[in-house]
Amino acid sequence: VHWSAEEKQLITGLWGKVNVAQCGGEALARLLIVYPWTQRFFSSFGNLSSPSAILGNPMVRAHGKKVLTSFGDAVKNMDNIKNTFAQLSELHCDKLHVDPENFRLLGDILIIVLAAHFAKDFTPECQAAWEKLVRVVAHALARKYH
């Protein structure tokens, strides 16, 4: 994947403003609410019975932070995303059996969360760069499935 200097700047510039705990928790909660079938991967998280239960669930927030922290590794290693996510791809494929389509859905949700938090900075050019990044990350996570 080739990244232009402008794409890298748009991604790293916005990433520097992201509150990983807040945006990560919100992104995972949105995923579980908007796409309820994804909840089956999180049965150990306790109460996921309603949107308010999901939004208030500390395990959802903690795992969302973990997910977005790991996404930060993509931002730091934009020229080597495939290798950066090799182990996570293996885990999600072989052990957790996550449908790789869910990675794309989470990427879409992350775009919405970033746009909501950074409306002024989230220009069409910025969105295009982030859309490319979430596609590349989703593809890297799905790599073990191919």
UniProtKB/Swiss-Prot annotation:
Red blood cells. Pfam families: Globin. Residues 2-146 form the Globin domain. Heme b binds at H63, H92. GO terms for cellular component: blood microparticle; haptoglobin-hemoglobin complex; hemoglobin complex. One of its GO terms (molecular function) is metal ion binding. Keywords: Heme, Iron, Metal-binding, Oxygen transport, Transport. PROSITE patterns: GLOBIN. GO terms for biological process: hydrogen peroxide catabolic process. It comes from the Eukaryota. Belongs to the globin family. Heterotetramer of two alpha chains and two beta chains. Involved in oxygen transport from the lung to the various peripheral tissues. This is Hemoglobin subunit beta. The lineage of its organism: Eukaryota, Metazoa, Chordata, Craniata, Vertebrata.
